[in-house]
Every structure is written in C-alpha cells, then in structure tokens.
C-alpha cells in the first residue's frame, strides 16, 4: 500500500444527532483510542512498512505468554486488541507512542470497519430483500419462500452463489467515505456522519479513506 494511512481503534457508543447550518445530521459516536504503538515494521527487516496499534484495557493475567512477551519487548502494558496498518510513514512512529483522535480533523473522510450485528438464520426476504410470493391467487403457504433456485433439466443444478436463506450478519464490514462531523479531544470522541457496523460497544477501526473524493471530504 503506497499511501499514508492514519488509523485508530475504538468502541461504538451509539447514535445521536447534531445541528449543522440549521440541518439535523445523524452521527455515530465512537470512543476512539487512545492507542499505543506496540511495533513498527520496516522494509529492511520485515519487507514492508507498517505500524501496529494496541487498544483496550485487559488484566495482564489473562494475556497469553507469547503476546505478553511481545508487549514486554515494546515496553508497553498489555492491551486487549491489536491491529496493523500498512503505511508509508511508519518510520515516523516510535514504540510506546500514544495515538489519539487529534490526527482526525473535522471534515476529513474516513473508512470505518467493524463486525455487523448477527441476525442468526434468516430467510431470503430478510437476508436479501426478496419480494416474496403473492398473498393470494394460488399461493399456498409459500409466501416468504425464495421461489425457483434452478430447473430440474435446465440448468439441472443450483448455481454457486445463489441467494438463499442462511446465516445473516456477524461478518466484517467496511463503510467507506464517511465524514468526521466533530472531534472531542478531551474525551477521545469522534462524531462520524451516518451509521457504522456493529452493536453498541463493538470494536471498530477508523482509517483515513482509501477512496476519498478529490477536493476534501465526501458530501
């Protein structure tokens, strides 16, 4: 990845709304960081440039010994979560450095990655938005069924990837080009326009947008 990436781990607190030029803007509040740098990778030693961020308090007794040794080597207290970001400016970071929300000014575009809410086993109407069958006129107790998934002779099989009922949610998902509405550096809060994946309290990764629109933040 040949670009500079700023990132931070945090927890989704929930949604609220703020006023902006007499308009109501829905925002998601993220308790972002502070994170600590636990490792810096370089082209000379590792073959690529990256920075490793650690986040979240944890009882040191619950940390496995290999991971505990990793933190001891970096001379930082153990954290619950670790993420690695490939960035060209990794050499500018140092072990033990604290990363806060100050690197995300208001108006910047960001990508937010998290794990979506798990919905369990769901039918095609809920999972894929199928219209369903008619309410009457010959339809018999099959109103929410998917319909045909493949003819008996042609094609004589079910194609791979056919949308059917199954487990819904609980997957890694990234929402791109969200705008940072406001930043609270005292309380380590990011207010991001729109919704982000996951329930309240879910772990999220906020990064500078990979496909940011030219001329500033995405509208």
UniProtKB/Swiss-Prot annotation:
Give the transmembrane region(s): none
Q: Which UniProt keywords apply?
A: Ribonucleoprotein, Ribosomal protein, RNA-binding, rRNA-binding
What GO cellular-component annotations does this UniProt entry give? cytosolic large ribosomal subunit
Q: Which Pfam families match?
A: Ribosomal_L3
- List the protein's name: Large ribosomal subunit protein uL3
What's the encoding gene here? rplC
Record's function text: One of the primary rRNA binding proteins, it binds directly near the 3'-end of the 23S rRNA, where it nucleates assembly of the 50S subunit.
Q: Which family does it belong to?
A: Belongs to the universal ribosomal protein uL3 family.
Does the entry feature the keyword Repeat, yes or no? Answer: no
* Subunit and partners: Part of the 50S ribosomal subunit. Forms a cluster with proteins L14 and L19.
The family database entries (InterPro entries) matched by this protein are listed as:
Ribosomal_uL3 (IPR000597), Ribosomal_uL3_bac/org-type (IPR019927), Ribosomal_uL3_CS (IPR019926), Transl_B-barrel_sf (IPR009000)
Q: Does the keyword ATP-binding apply?
A: no
The UniProt GO MF terms for this protein read: rRNA binding; structural constituent of ribosome
GO terms under biological process = translation
Q: So which residues are the signal peptide here?
A: none
Question: Which NCBIfam families did the record assign?
Answer: L3_bact (TIGR03625)
**UniProt feature coiled coil, ranges:** none
